[in-house]
Amino acid sequence: MFTAKKFSDLTVEELNAIYIARSKVFTVGQQLTVQEPDLADRQAVHFFSQNDAGEVVAYMRLIDLEKIEDDHYEQVSGAYALSRVAVLKTLRGQGMGRKLLDAAIQWVRDETEATKIIIDAQAYLRDSYYAPVGFVQVGEEFREAGLPHVKMILEL
Amino acid sequence: MFTIKNFDELTNTELYAICAQRVAVFVVEQNCPYQDIDGLDPRCQHMFVMNNGEIDAYLRVFDRGTVDDHHSPRREGVASLGRIITGPKARGKGMGHQLVAAGIEHVRTTMPHVHTIFISAQEHLAETYYGKHGFERVSEVYLEDDIPHVDMELKL
């Protein structure tokens, strides 16, 4: 159901479909005028589900924080980050977001040596989405791209 | 000087650079949260200059006789140029004019059935920029994503 691919393994059609989905969810859906896409894409694993028409309907990117070289991510040994977590509006309320998160965590468990997953979560999703699978907030709420965020960690 | 490619000839690195620079200019710089990555790109040709992994100048070209999109209804014999940008680092060197001239020349030489080139121009550029290449206003000024635009055409 979910595909996990490094940037260089994506087809150009898949990459375009990912960017359409992210544009819909973040730029338009949340009216964000931040740089999207950004350079971290090229170092990320892209984790997504497509419908029969090839549209990406659920997406996130997974970043190896031990190796990342990017201004927006601090290096952390033994950790992966989840970011740009997105489900198309038309698919919401059907458990797709939950499946996406569960599958991504399982992928990190199975495919990497990471001992924890870190996320800068939009604050409104803290209790309803991330806490139920074991993510715990660390530190205070902060603003990023004008929206309240919290850092959360899941120990694997 | 300019590279021109069909969508399926683009590398992932090129598509990334194109999308990143379009969003940098149209979404971030102009503070306009609209869906720049709109799904039309697979049916366009992409003309660009890249420098150290960044896009200096870009436009996309498509044959309106083969595309039917809610923003761009089908019109036989018409080609559209769109998403015309120069990157922040490349401005003030005349590259934008070279780009538009190359786009027009590309349509002339490779699309013999096309008699008209259409653009939806940001209004402040109508005379200073597109008018210099022979484009003339064919509509009243209208707002698109809150930015004044005007339709312009160049008869070949």
PLM regions and their residue ranges:
Chain A
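Conserved GNAT acetyl-CoA-binding A-motif
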Residues: 108-123
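Conserved acetyl-CoA-binding loop-helix of GNAT-fold acetyltransferases
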Residues: 87, 93-106
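Conserved beta-strand in the GNAT
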Residues: 48, 55-71, 81-86
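Conserved active-site alpha-helix within GNAT-family acetyltransferase domains
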Residues: 123-140, 145-146
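Short amphipathic alpha-helix that is part of the acyltransferase structural core
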Residues: 1-55
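A conserved beta-turn-beta hairpin within the catalytic core of GNAT-like acetyltransferases
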Residues: 65-82, 92, 111-115
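Short hydrophobic/aromatic beta-strand element in the GNAT-like acyltransferase core
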Residues: 32-34, 44-48, 59, 84, ...
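Short C-terminal beta-strand
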Residues: 151-155
